[in-house]
Amino acid sequence: MIKRPRRLRTNEVLRKAVRETRLSTDSLIWPLFIVEGKNIKKEISSLPGQYHFSPDMVGKAIEAALKADVKSVLLFGLPKHKDEKGSEAYNENGVLQQGIREIKQRYPQMQVITDICMCEYTSHGHCGILEGERVDNDRTLPYLEKIALSHVMAGADMIAPSDMMDGRIYALRSTLDKNGFTDIPIMSYAVKYASSFYGPFREAA
């Protein structure tokens, strides 16, 4: 597989985000949680000052981000319908896909990164397809590919897989390249910390 570091040099926002260590708003990414419905801006009790937004209200968060000179957001979707295969995750009209389109149509300068996982979308809450009582790693990969492709086709600038499936990066990169999205970067979730911060996140997502 060809390595393409040029992906990280395609625009000024991205170049500033990945350059050598420098403390500035260029390096900040604001996580946003998109829920189904209309006219929703509901505070997340475990994360004071953070909110669930419906797609039609997410513009308020983007305007606040841009005012604070934050140029990147990381989107998480929270659908009402969940099933064993997390089908809303790759629905072209799903809640996250709606949120992506809303942001990119109104604020094209905002860099939109999307979380690639299934736990928010599956009825059992696991990050993949279950086979009995275990997650079937290899059966899950094609679903992650569909999720990533649906996000990028909706307008996402970058994807960030958090699913922990073996082989996912090769699968996602191959699918993006095969469909003409060779310039879409994949952001690593490689560094994670044992922390109490994960508890509040689980309520948010």
Swiss-Prot record:
Residues the entry annotates as binding substrate: 202
Binding-site list for Zn(2+): 117, 119, 127
Family matches, as InterPro entries: ALAD, Aldolase_TIM
One family name in Pfam for this protein: ALAD
E.C. no: 4.2.1.24
Catalytic residues (positions): 192
Cofactor(s) demanded: Zn(2+)
GO biological process, one term: protoporphyrinogen IX biosynthetic process
Annotated cofactor note: Binds 1 zinc ion per monomer.
Record's subunit section: Homooctamer.
Name used for this protein in its record: Delta-aminolevulinic acid dehydratase
Organism: Ruminiclostridium josui (Clostridium josui)
